[in-house]
Amino acid sequence: MVRNSFISIISQKENKENRGSVEFQVLSFTTKIRRLTSHLKLHKTDYSSERGLRKILGKRQRVLAYLSKKNRVRYQELQDLISQLNIRETKTR
């Protein structure tokens, strides 16, 4: 899978000291989102997991919006990873 290769690349690159970096957070949120999405395909009436999915989607959106406002250069570097993970572009004000 493509996403597992990204996890291994970023995990090796970042090690343990940079787990709070935006790239690592976006990647970990994306893996959680995909796992919950596949769970919800099997269990359509699991509303608590659906709520958790919406919360994680919001967290990922806020992290990306924060980065686009604070550091535009790093956000442009992250665009390649965002496009490869099939994340839709966030709407900024």
UniProtKB/Swiss-Prot annotation:
SUPFAM superfamilies reported in the protein's UniProt record: S15/NS1 RNA-binding domain
SMART domains with a match to the protein in the record: Ribosomal_S15
One annotated GO molecular function: structural constituent of ribosome
Record Gene3D superfamilies: S15/NS1, RNA-binding (1.10.287.10)
Locations listed in the record: Plastid, Chloroplast
Family matches, as Pfam families: Ribosomal_S15
Keyword line: Chloroplast, Plastid, Ribonucleoprotein, Ribosomal protein
HAMAP family in alphabetical order: Ribosomal_uS15_B
Subunit structure: Part of the 30S ribosomal subunit.
This protein's name: Small ribosomal subunit protein uS15c
